C-alpha cells in the first residue's frame, strides 16, 4: 500500500465547526510537525495573542489569500499573498485579518530538527 494521504481542504475537520481553524495535520496524519489552515473574515478580533514558549515550537505562516497584519510584540508586519513569516517560540504573536479577510497555512515545529540552510 502506498504511504500517501490526499485531502481537499473541504474534507478537513474544523475546530468549533465554523471553518476558521482546519486541522490539516490531523486530516493528513502528519506526526512530525503541526499544521493548520486558518481562515478569518475582515474584522475578526478573537485571534489569541500567544507564544509557544511552553511547547518550544516556532511557527511559520504562509498567506495564500487576502492579507493580514502579524503583530509581534511592539512590531507589526504586513502579510500579503505569497508571504511567509517565521515567529520564534517565545515571541508573542497575533494575526489581524486585512480588509478582505485572510486565509493562511500555519506550520509549527521544534527548532533544530533541520539545518537552516537545507
What are these regions (language model features)?
Residues 29-31, 71-75, 98:
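Short strand-coil-strand connectors
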Residues 74-89:
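Short acidic-glycine-tyrosine-enriched beta hairpin
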Residues 48, 70-71, 87, 93-99:
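Short beta-strand His + acidic residue motifs that chelate non-heme Fe in jelly-roll/DSBH
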Residues 36-55:
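Conserved short histidine dyad/triad with adjacent acidic residue
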Residues 56-69, 73:
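Glycine- and acidic-residue-biased ligand/ion/polar-headgroup-sensing regions
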Residues 94-118:
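Double-stranded beta-helix
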Residues 1-34, 41, 115-118:
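A short, N-terminal "cap"/entry segment at the start of jelly-roll beta-barrel domains
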Residues 36-38, 61, 105:
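Conserved hydrophobic/aromatic positions in well-ordered beta-strands
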Amino acid at each position: 500500500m502506498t504511504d500517501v494521504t490526499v485531502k481537499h481542504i473541504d474534507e478537513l475537520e474544523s475546530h468549533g465547526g465554523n471553518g476558521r481553524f482546519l486541522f490539516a495535520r490531523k486530516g493528513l496524519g502528519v506526526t512530525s510537525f503541526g499544521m493548520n489552515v486558518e481562515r478569518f473574515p475582515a474584522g475578526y478580533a478573537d485571534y489569541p495573542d500567544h507564544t509557544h514558549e511552553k511547547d518550544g515550537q516556532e511557527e511559520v505562516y504562509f498567506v495564500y489569500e487576502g492579507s493580514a497584519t502579524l503583530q509581534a510584540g511592539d512590531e507589526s508586519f504586513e502579510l500579503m499573498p505569497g508571504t511567509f513569516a517565521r515567529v520564534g517560540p517565545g515571541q508573542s504573536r497575533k494575526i489581524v485579518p486585512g480588509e478582505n479577510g485572510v486565509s493562511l497555512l500555519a506550520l509549527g515545529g521544534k527548532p533544530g530538527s533541520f539545518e537552516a540552510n537545507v
